Amino acid sequence: MAKKSMKNRELKRQLTVAKFAKKRAELKATIVNLNASPEERFAAVVALQKQPRDASASRLRNRCRLTGRPHGVYRKFGLGRNKLREAAMRGDVPGLVKASW
């Protein structure tokens, strides 16, 4: 189990990313727009750098919804490999069966 503080930190990051997503997209569009003046583009770069570090989506980490485990998480289910296996063995995941050949 991950510490509660790590889970809360990740939740806070998700909220920060959602809060700044629209503004970041606008600034990035200005930066890559070749029709904008160099001063406008530079101002957009500076504004983007002044935003909080956690506003970037690349700071997010996929974590297991049940345990908070950061590694071995299946995106499709949002669960870590251990909890996904347990859920599959209980029959909680429809259509998921253990491989046998």
Swiss-Prot record:
Q: Which SUPFAM superfamilies match?
A: Glucocorticoid receptor-like (DNA-binding domain) (SSF57716)
Q: Which stretches are annotated as coiled coil?
A: none
- InterPro entries, from UniProt? Ribosomal_uS14, Ribosomal_uS14_bac/plastid
Keyword annotations for this protein, in alphabetical order, are: Ribonucleoprotein, Ribosomal protein, RNA-binding, rRNA-binding
State any GO BP term from the record.
Answer: translation
Q: A Gene Ontology molecular-function term?
A: rRNA binding
Q: Name one Pfam family in it.
A: Ribosomal_S14
Record's GO cellular component, any one?
small ribosomal subunit
UniProt subunit comment: Part of the 30S ribosomal subunit. Contacts proteins S3 and S10.
Entry function: Binds 16S rRNA, required for the assembly of 30S particles and may also be responsible for determining the conformation of the 16S rRNA at the A site.
Query: Which family does the record claim for this protein?
Result: Belongs to the universal ribosomal protein uS14 family.
Q: Please give the HAMAP family that the UniProt record associates with this protein.
A: Ribosomal_uS14_1
Q: What is this protein called?
A: Small ribosomal subunit protein uS14
Organism of provenance: Pseudomonas entomophila (strain L48)
